[in-house]
Amino acid sequence: MDHPREKEADRPVRSSKVPQGRSGHSRPSSSSASSGVLMVGPNFRVGKKIGCGNFGELKLGKNLYTNEYVAIKLEPVKSRAPQLHLEYRFYKTLGSADGLPQVFYFGPCGKYNAMVLELLGPSLEDLFDLCDRTFSLKTVLMIAIQLISRMEYVHSKNLIYRDVKPENFLIGRQGNKKEHIIHIIDFGLAKEYIDPETKKHIPYREHKSLTGTARYMSINTHLGKEQSRRDDLEALGHMFMYFLRGSLPWQGLKADTLKERYQKIGDTKRNTPIEVLCENFPEEMATYLRYVRRLDFFEKPDYDYLRNLFTELFDRKGYAFDYSYDWVGRQIPTPVGTVHVDSGASAITRESHAHRDRPSQHQPLRNQVVSSTNGELNADDPLAAHSNAPITAQAEVEVVDEAKCCCFFKRKRKKNTPRHK
């Protein structure tokens, strides 16, 4: 998961006290038996590598008490830009809500900090590839309605996300009751926009380093302006158009240096009229982008207005909110094979969806986390492929345009030609 990173000094203040997870966390945090089996906490066995990113590595794990597979996120204790502890703290802040999977454990594991995560299904980027890199309007609207609510909930907890990209939104595992829900993952770049001490909005600043993924980030982020709630929503709008078009006009730009490339991306975004970007698609897509780009730095977005833009369009088109996404009925690769997504999967009524996708302000606090793994696992135990390869810490500040992720698909690079429905 490569993305531009802000300077460490600009990160929210980290607590020096390592938070404890669930039951049993006061016991030894890690162990290595004579057989060479690596353990995290008292009951999580570490297996093969299934992903990687700026934080370090993602490993397959198994809860030896319940026999359930999990994901284990490992970050070197001596990382140049540590984020795992901060991410864990943000998940405690977020608590329990729809589309926020669980964290089962956080603590030291030898030379690493470890967070044990819930396994989820494939990312929207994986599914986009599976669907020949274009989504129907119905699928995009079902995604958009959910993600506006996800972002509203995150913002309600005084956090901004700052890492919008398709790789960071995952469906649930097949066969799970949450398999049709779009989950938001990876809060390593999140930031408190309300100062926890003063309870005031962070000040407007300029000359900030880029944070996020250049393909989707807001125009103001390219200009070096401090991010706020408006920027998360603008980045979502760019992602929605990416799904509808198949690509964005600022993809594939060439330059001699990374700095020049990001400058070109930002310039192209500014110079591409919204009407051109959204040409041949419903006016609501352009209305959404115009609204979020006009928001003031301190302004609270009208999430209901944005949601209603898309729900009214959805109704006008005569769609049913049955979670029949474009990928339903296709074979979805997993770490151990393929899973057929049943087109007759349990449908949820529009009314229940509408109720569920409104963020709850009274959710009980519960440790949560996300997994950037994709797919599900069967009864075969792949943990024997455990690797002790060292983790290389990433640079403190990294700027990368291409939305990279660790997935179970072999990506095919395609020409960036817009696709229209």
From Swiss-Prot:
ATP binds at I50, G51, C52, G53, N54, F55, G56, E57, L58, K73. Casein kinases are operationally defined by their preferential utilization of acidic proteins such as caseins as substrates. It can phosphorylate a large number of proteins. Participates in Wnt signaling. Residues 44-314 form the Protein kinase domain. This is Casein kinase I isoform gamma-1. Its EC number is 2.7.11.1. It is found in: Cytoplasm. Autophosphorylated. The gene is csnk1g1. Residues 1-13 have a biased composition (Basic and acidic residues). Residues 21-36 have a biased composition (Low complexity). Keywords: ATP-binding, Cytoplasm, Kinase, Nucleotide-binding, Serine/threonine-protein kinase, Transferase, Wnt signaling pathway. Residues 1-36 are annotated as: Disordered.
